Swiss-Prot record:
Keywords: ATP synthesis, CF(1), Hydrogen ion transport, Ion transport, Membrane, Thylakoid, Transport. The gene is atpH. It comes from Prochlorococcus marinus subsp. pastoris (strain CCMP1986 / NIES-2087 / MED4). It is a peripheral membrane protein. This is ATP synthase subunit delta. It comes from the Bacteria. Belongs to the ATPase delta chain family. It holds the Pfam family OSCP. Its main location: membrane. It is found in: Cellular thylakoid membrane.
Length: 180
């Protein structure tokens, strides 16, 4: 990943600098998350943008057609620039790096919580408080995922720290202790 970061970081930093100067950082963060979600939910779009067969002008037309009404002009121009520079194929990596740099600069930790079922707002609040204490940060961005194989409970990860409070893990531990 360090090689990819050496390509993505300058673009991500440039986008962050432009939106910071225009006082659009928070708005851009929301739009980047929506754009990433849209691209990740549409594998065909990602393949199309990454295709070496399509001409740059065709990719730019596709970008304009799909995104001109959905994102602000700064982000649209950024996507067209990436197409011009033959970097649109790694747009998701660049946008992910943009969010990483934003979180680093804003002292926001990213936590992923996987649970067997959808968490309620109260549960998310309690888990967020626990993770903030463990991570030693004041701000936390919580990403939730659902994995029914956990049976119950949750698995949370922040950086290299993992909290496994899942029922599946407890059953596995019980099975190991009984087999001894």
């Amino acid at each position: 990943m360090p090689l990819l970061n050496s390509v993505t970081t300058p673009y991500a930093e440039a986008l962050l600098q432009v939106v910071s100067e225009n006082d659009q950082t928070e708005e851009m963060v929301k739009e980047v998350k929506q754009l990433l979600s849209l691209i990740n939910d549409s594998p065909d779009l990602e393949k199309t943008l990454s295709s070496p067969v399509l001409e740059t002008d065709t990719k730019k037309k596709i970008i304009i057609e799909i995104f001109s009404e959905k994102i602000n002009s700064s982000l649209l121009n950024f996507l067209k620039l990436l197409a011009d520079r033959q970097r649109i194929g790694i747009v998701t990596s660049i946008l992910d790096r943009f969010l990483e740099i934003y979180r680093e600069n804003s002292n926001i930790a990213l936590a992923t919580v996987t649970s067997a079922v959808e968490l309620t707002d109260d549960q998310k609040g309690l888990i967020t408080k626990k993770i903030i204490n463990i991570a030693g940060t004041e701000k936390l961005e919580l990403v939730t995922k659902i994995d029914p194989s956990l049976i119950g409970g949750f698995v949370a990860s922040v950086g290299s720290k993992v909290i496994d409070a899942s029922l599946a893990s407890q059953i596995r531990k019980l099975g190991l202790s009984l087999s001894k």
